[in-house]
Amino acid sequence: MSTVQQAYELAKKQFADIGVDTEQALALLDQLPISMHCWQGDDVSGFEQGAGALSGGIQTTGNYPGKARTPQELRADLDKAVSLIPGKKRLNLHASYLEADHRVDRNEVKPEHFANWVAWAKANNMGLDFNPTYFSHPLSAEATLSHQNKEIRDFWIEHGKACRKISEYFGKELGTASVMNIWIPDGSKDFVVDKFAPRQRLVEALDEIIAEKIDAKYHLDAVESKLFGIGVESYTVGSNEFYAAYAVSRGTALCLDAGHFHPTEVISDKISAVMPFVQHLLLHVSRPVRWDSDHVVLLDDETQAIAGEIIRNQLFDRVHIGLDFFDASINRIAAWVIGTRNMQKALLRALLEPTDELRALENARDFGSRLALLEEQKSLPWQAVWDMYCERHNVPVGRRWLDEVRAYEKTVLSQRV
């Protein structure tokens, strides 16, 4: 019996003593996919021919060597990251990651431009999620779906429609629904006199985009708000209230991004607030440092609280977990592995909680016992259960994954000059 197995058997007994079945927890964890975001691997550059600079208030900071420059390099880097992460995974793509031998404008994207991604996903037994790309384009400089100019607005509406067909294609090819999330950077740097008209235009544009019914077996629409962005500090057309109302009234999923709110707000508190009103919720788990900085996800209090809300309320089939961070100052594969494994660790810790006992204490208003058990829970050997999970999935246990990342950096990433 290995050291990992010995530690697991001891941990299994300790959790059994408080009524928690570790085998059941591991089985449930296997059913909770994490959607990894492709854009960590190339600093949100994408593969459009003749693409412009990153815009829309999005910034990647740092210049760590080894950034993926081609679809082939990005998929190779993803292969390495996926090999170091246990459990069920998906990949989240932006429209700007299309592949073509000529320039394809945003309103002309087609499923065929993502055939290589579908083949890769099939080979890795992973689902795909999707995002229209409403930034880093000459026609996104002023606004997109809320633009006063109907021609520009129509261009972006066509992009949204085209992306829904790609998302549907993903779902049909891979046998799992693709969640397509709409986020736009539209807003204003300074004071706005007419805030209503852009929002009315956005409503009409979104309605036109989602007018064609697509089977939910293949595709789900989601909409994402933001408090502010660089260059749009004073007014954001797609605010939280706007998209919450839109999702409820139109039956779409709502996306909550951990970095898209005021620094004192947390999305863990918003999950139970919106779930009575929407069927599906998309999460972009991130780490905002004073603003939407998209730092790598930590195993911190908020990540744990997000996981706890999903597990305690058994929202397994209704909440879709995606990651959204991009750090160009560190090894990009390490960033994927750290962030994804941390999200999985948080879910496992939540699955190892004696929730029924805690809820009973809460209902009995025995808050002292509730606090005591929540604190004692932190000292239980969940790490041994996590190590067992990694071993069963044939991925490195503990810090050993870092050795593989360093070796890959030496043999592959260092050659990208």
From Swiss-Prot:
Question: What's the main place this protein lives?
Answer: cytoplasm
Q: Please provide, alphabetically and separated by semicolons, the GO molecular function terms listed in this UniProt record.
A: L-rhamnose isomerase activity; manganese ion binding
Q: What is its EC number?
A: 5.3.1.14
The note describing how and how many cofactors are bound reads: Binds 1 Mn(2+) ion per subunit.
Function comment: Catalyzes the interconversion of L-rhamnose and L-rhamnulose.
This protein's name? L-rhamnose isomerase
One GO biological process term: rhamnose catabolic process
Where in or outside the cell is it found? Cytoplasm
Pathways per UniProt: Carbohydrate degradation; L-rhamnose degradation; glycerone phosphate from L-rhamnose: step 1/3
The source's domain of life comes to Bacteria
**Keyword annotations of the record:** Cytoplasm, Isomerase, Manganese, Metal-binding, Rhamnose metabolism
Recorded catalytic activity of this chain's protein? L-rhamnopyranose = L-rhamnulose
Broad EC category: isomerase
